[in-house]
A protein has these predicted regions:
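Short loop/turn motifs that connect adjacent beta-strands in outer-membrane beta-barrel proteins
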Residues: 16-17, 50-60, 64-69, 103-105, ...
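Flexible glycine-rich, low-complexity coil/linker segments exposed to the extracellular/periplasmic environment
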Residues: 41-107, 144-174, 185, 283
Length: 284
């Protein structure tokens, strides 16, 4: 991979304890390393089989990454494949999806940060907000990607068969266009607490987009975590120990439903539900 990165930003401190940052950035990466994808491999296999027709069926294998069972002898004898105009093939055993240099990727966006600290008689408070916004996420097809794109543009591959991984990728398949993180902390003496919120924007799942353009939208998801700390000393050596009780996903938010393994989009979400932990640390 080779990439060109550009960023520009500024920092403001309008009042004591308040800092505001803003950064605009762009990344252009050539020969991006990634997976071609099982779906793309099977579509590419289909394209090669239709293009080959019934020529050299004894040696033709289609896309070698798509490993198939032997064709059903009954279907061959009944002439189904001959009627369809393709060489006989069986069901897919597995797809060997290895990492490749695929395409040129361009990503542009900006980040906003707000940091505020204030000391009061009730304790010390700190607020941290970071918002990330993506304006552009595009991938120009190369290699097999380019072949698939050309065939779909020519009508050889139906428009309602999704080809993933090139074109405008923003807002689809886990590529949400915004993410917000807010953290509020409090401390007074030996006690401390925090509230953290994480929100990821919505996106659509291309594999469930219908031929009339109707999108299957995966809604945004917001998760809150809560912690309470207590610091104390062991053998009179100062506050060298800390115990923390935490609640992860305090509102028990579940991941939005998606057409993926386990029923949610694991590249973007987790689905652990509300969970707890206790952490004990000692500095010697």
């Amino acid at each position: 991979e080779e990439s060109d990165n550009t960023s520009v930003g500024f920092v403001l401190t309008p009042v004591d304890g308040l800092t505001i940052t803003a950064d605009y950035w762009t990344i252009e990466k050539e020969n991006t390393i990634g997976l071609f994808g099982r779906n793309n491999h099977t579509v590419y296999d289909m394209m090669l089989r239709w293009a080959n027709g019934t020529n050299n069926c004894g040696s033709f294998v289609g896309n070698p990454a798509v490993v198939r069972e032997a064709p059903d002898s009954g279907d061959v004898e009944d002439g189904y494949f001959a009627t369809a105009g393709v060489c006989p093939f069986g069901t897919i055993k597995y797809v060997g999806d290895n990492y490749l240099n695929l395409a040129t990727r361009t990503i542009e966006g900006y980040d906003i940060g707000i940091y505020y600290d204030v000391d009061t008689d009730f304790g010390d408070f700190a607020v941290r907000y970071i918002g990330s916004f993506i304006d552009k996420f595009e991938q120009t097809p190369g290699g097999e990607f380019a072949a698939l794109a050309a065939q779909q543009a020519a009508g050889a591959i139906p428009a309602d068969i999704p080809i993933d991984g090139f074109g405008d990728l923003l807002g689809q398949n886990g590529n949400y266009d915004e993410k917000h993180r807010l953290r509020v902390t409090w401390s007074k003496g030996s006690w401390g607490a925090s509230l953290t919120g994480l929100r990821k924007g919505d996106f659509y799942q291309s594999s469930l987009t219908t031929s009339d353009g109707t999108l299957f939208v995966i809604p945004s998801m917001t998760v809150f975590d809560v912690t309470v700390d207590y610091k104390f000393s062991i053998k009179g050596s100062g506050n060298n120990a800390r115990i923390r009780f935490a609640v992860k996903n305090a509102a028990d938010e579940r991941a939005p439903t998606a057409d993926r393994y386990y029923g949610y989009f694991a590249d973007a979400h987790t689905d652990l539900g509300r969970n707890f932990y206790v952490d004990f640390r000692v500095s010697l």
